[in-house]
A protein has these predicted regions:
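Residues at the starts of beta-strands that form the adenosine-phosphate
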Residues: 90, 110, 135-138
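Conserved small/polar residues in nucleotide/adenosyl-binding loops
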Residues: 141
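Cofactor-binding loop segments of dinucleotide-utilizing enzymes, especially the Rossmann-like FAD-
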Residues: 73, 96, 116
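Ferredoxin-reductase
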Residues: 2-87
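Generic structural signal for buried aliphatic residues
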Residues: 40, 91-94
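Histidine-anchored nucleotide/phosphate-binding helix
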Residues: 122-131
């Protein structure tokens, strides 16, 4: 799958908890194909301690809005800076990275999606894609 380096615009940064934010980024053009379970490398500017990009799981892709969401746990300088991003800010990302989940070929009566903490991030997009393919994902939070 081809990789892209994109400058995306922050549309919303929602504080979900003291240590978690939902960062929504939009593109002026259609987003590339992304699979559930893939991730992006997000550049954090403005600090000497954040030289490397941060790997963040793709939480959801809204094709109608050309928007990609990231659930971010604020655990270090880089993720804390991302947690401070404001609507209108530009964020540079490399995506999609990783292989994503192997999707079942035959529709199933029930599939259990399990994740904890920030590990729940890719479950939203995975559940939606499974449902589109005739599966019935079960979730428990």
């Amino acid at each position: 799958m081809k990789k892209y380096i994109l400058d995306l615009t922050v549309t919303e940064n929602v504080r979900l908890h003291a240590n978690y934010v939902l960062l929504k980024l939009t593109s002026p053009s259609p987003l590339p194909d992304m699979l559930p379970g893939q991730f992006a490398e997000i550049r954090v500017d403005g600090s000497p301690t954040t030289f490397l990009r941060r790997p963040i799981s793709i939480n959801y892709v809204d094709r109608q809005r050309n928007e990609v969401w990231f659930l971010i746990q604020l655990i270090g300088d880089g993720t804390r800076q991302l947690g401070e991003a404001k609507a209108g800010d530009t964020v540079n990302v490399v995506l999609p990275l990783g292989n994503g989940y192997t999707m079942p070929q035959k529709p199933s009566d029930k599939l259990l999606l399990v994740g904890g903490g920030v590990g729940t991030a890719p479950m939203l997009y995975l559940g939606e894609q499974l449902a589109k393919n005739g599966h019935k994902p079960v979730s428990y939070t």
